[in-house]
Every structure is written in C-alpha cells, then in structure tokens.
C-alpha cells in the first residue's frame, strides 16, 4: 500500500529534477518551459496526494485550475518562442538581449 510519504517523495523528486533541469540548461527556452511544467506536475501530485489522504476534494479541484493555467502558460510561451525564432533564428536565452523595445 502506498502511503502519503511515497507520493510526497515522488513530488519532491519531480520538483528536484525540474530545478536541476533549469539550472543545468539555461540556454534553451524549450527545456526551461518543460522544466517549469514538470514543477507544476510535481505540485499537482502533492495536491492530489494530500487531497486523497485528507478526504477532501478541494485539492483535486485546485489541480484543474493549475492545469488550466499551465496550459495557458505553455501556449503563450510557445507563441513567444515561435515569434523569437522568426525574429532571431535562434531560441537561446542569451540572445534575448538583441531584441529592441
């Protein structure tokens, strides 16, 4: 039987992998966005685990709101990424200082 601690450890591992992904690769915007999405997934895992073990559905309902915000964030981030690639022909974070405005 899986306990609450197992799910919390899983969430912590996912969150740590996302943090490592951001710190090890600061150049590629796509990988940074994927790491942020992995962080949100880890938080959602913890919400569902706490919600299940406390017998309350508020955590599970909140997960739907977080997923909605994550989907909007991914769509806006990818739209900015496509515009950046069309403008600069690169997706490196270091080249963002070439933009004017």
Swiss-Prot record:
Gene Ontology MF terms in the entry: NADH:ubiquinone reductase (non-electrogenic) activity; quinone binding
One BP annotation, GO: ATP synthesis coupled electron transport
One Pfam short name: Oxidored_q2
Enzyme Commission (EC) number: 7.1.1.-
Source taxon at top rank: Bacteria
Main location as per UniProt: membrane
Catalytic activity: a quinone + NADH + 5 H(+)(in) = a quinol + NAD(+) + 4 H(+)(out)
Membrane topology according to the record: Multi-pass membrane protein
Principal EC category: translocase
Record-linked PANTHER family: NADH DEHYDROGENASE SUBUNIT 4L-RELATED, NADH-UBIQUINONE OXIDOREDUCTASE SUBUNIT ND4L
Biological role stated in the UniProt entry: NDH-1 shuttles electrons from NADH, via FMN and iron-sulfur (Fe-S) centers, to quinones in the respiratory chain. The immediate electron acceptor for the enzyme in this species is believed to be ubiquinone. Couples the redox reaction to proton translocation (for every two electrons transferred, four hydrogen ions are translocated across the cytoplasmic membrane), and thus conserves the redox energy in a proton gradient.
Family: Belongs to the complex I subunit 4L family.
Subunit structure as annotated in this protein's UniProt entry: NDH-1 is composed of 14 different subunits. Subunits NuoA, H, J, K, L, M, N constitute the membrane sector of the complex.
HAMAP family tied to this protein: NDH1_NuoK
The protein's name: NADH-quinone oxidoreductase subunit K
Organism for this UniProt entry: Burkholderia multivorans (strain ATCC 17616 / 249)
